[in-house]
């Protein structure tokens, strides 16, 4: 008997796979537990439609992430901080401050998505990586000046 998996099933397959199983396994386990549906032509067409729709949404989100990355790449943030005589900051520039600066520039970004290679504790020009999407990241330029 052929079934379409609705869940990942160990030693059988992943979501959306069409697999051939024993009729008893399908009737007594997979179908009642909701792990699979019978592989009829109607269900197969619905599965293909759902896959196409999911792929379309995925591409749309990826395209929006690429546009946001281009916008972030074009930005250069300037942060004024108090510093001592040797240009060392009192404190450090954090990803939270960078998120607030991005918000002031019209880009809403969670601070956890902004990654600093090392803490910014001196005056100068630095870069930070912004992880927008698992496949898309942008480099943000940050200039730290004396307040």
UniProtKB/Swiss-Prot annotation:
Question: Know the name of this protein?
Answer: Large ribosomal subunit protein bL9
Gene3D superfamilies given for it?
Ribosomal protein L9, C-terminal domain, Ribosomal protein L9, N-terminal domain
How is this protein annotated for GO cellular component?
A: ribonucleoprotein complex; ribosome
What family classification does the UniProt entry report for this protein? Belongs to the bacterial ribosomal protein bL9 family.
Tell whether rRNA-binding is among the UniProt keywords.
yes
Protein keywords: Ribonucleoprotein, Ribosomal protein, RNA-binding, rRNA-binding
- The gene for this chain is rplI
GO molecular-function terms, A-Z: rRNA binding; structural constituent of ribosome
* Taxonomic lineage: Bacteria, Pseudomonadati, Thermodesulfobacteriota, Desulfuromonadia, Geobacterales
InterPro entries in UniProt: Ribosomal_bL9, Ribosomal_bL9/RNase_H1_N, Ribosomal_bL9_bac/chp, Ribosomal_bL9_C, Ribosomal_bL9_C_sf, Ribosomal_bL9_N, Ribosomal_bL9_N_sf
Main role?
Binds to the 23S rRNA.
